A protein has these predicted regions:
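Cationic-aromatic interfacial patches
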Residues: 7-86
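N-terminal export leaders
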Residues: 1-3
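Conserved, short, structured surface segments that act as functional micro-motifs
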Residues: 192-197, 201, 217-265
Length: 265
């Protein structure tokens, strides 16, 4: 989702106050009785537990963002203000070959990015509920979602997931019911599992020491999909847990804890 989105031929919801501010990487919840459908630009989707949920991409440009829904036979809109958010800077030192890529490695990364991009456009019936289940039990403190990474002194793209330090071999668990959309060995992500949960929600589990599922296999919430490792570009054993919802890079903490979701009136 690049740039601000404006919806035409719709009147603002009566009683709307000043637009609430939201941060990139969050999820906005707009609840009311009688919601029939939700929309954002040309995308339409079904309400979840009586509310519309709008994921805000980590790189969503600051500015007004207009949300819409159909409720009791009428179309309603509201506006939120996507603000600038200063995520922390993370400095890492890694082997040179993992930062300054050879022609072959660069071609591999580009191919893997294309393979992942196809997953972000998947659509199907919703198979999950909120909050999601933790991918580790117990779940350690995570961090660094959205951090601006400086690797070997060179600025790199923001971190689009959350890293959880855990012992090598610790079980990694599916966050919700779904289908294994892809299993891969990636240059950056190492051994990785991607699970499609429907409604455009895909969770990813990276740097695994082993993979316990196969592509096309159904998985249940809390089922083991692999084990913590340090494969790919990693400084030590940890789980990189990422979430894409309708293409947007979302902070996993938002979907693991309902208190983190930003509710608007």
């Amino acid at each position: 989702m690049a740039g601000a989105i404006a919806l035409a031929s719709a009147a603002p919801t009566p009683g709307a106050a000043a637009a609430p501010r939201v941060r990139p990487g969050t999820v906005v919840r707009w609840a009311a009785e009688g919601i029939e459908s939700c929309s954002l630009g040309e995308k339409r989707f079904e309400p979840l537990d009586g509310a519309c949920y709008y994921p805000v991409d980590l790189l969503q440009r600051a500015g007004p963002w207009t949300l819409a829904r159909a409720r009791r036979g009428r179309r309603e809109t509201t506006t939120v203000q996507v603000g600038k958010f200063d995520y922390p800077t993370q400095r890492l030192t890694l082997p040179r070959r993992m930062v300054e890529l050879s022609k072959e490695d660069l071609e591999r990364v580009e191919r893997e990015n294309r393979e992942m991009a196809r997953l972000w456009t998947r659509a199907g019936p919703r198979r999950f509920s909120l909050p999601l289940a933790a991918p580790l039990d117990p779940l350690p403190k995570g961090g660094r979602f959205g951090s601006r990474r400086i690797i070997n002194g060179q600025p790199r793209s923001p971190h689009g997931g959350t890293d959880y330090s855990a012992p090598e071999g610790a079980p990694v668990l599916a966050a919700a019911d779904g289908t294994v959309a892809m299993v891969a060995n990636q240059f950056f992500g190492g051994n990785a599992v991607f699970v499609d949960h429907g409604d455009g929600l895909v969770t990813m589990y990276m740097h695994l020491s082993r993979v316990d599922v196969h592509e096309g296999e159904p998985v249940r919430r809390g089922e083991r999909v692999g084990a913590v490792g340090s494969t790919g570009r990693a400084t030590g054993p940890h789980l990189h847990f990422g979430v894409r919802w309708r293409g947007a890079r979302v902070d996993p903490a938002v979907l693991l804890d309902p208190q983190e979701i930003q509710a608007i009136g």
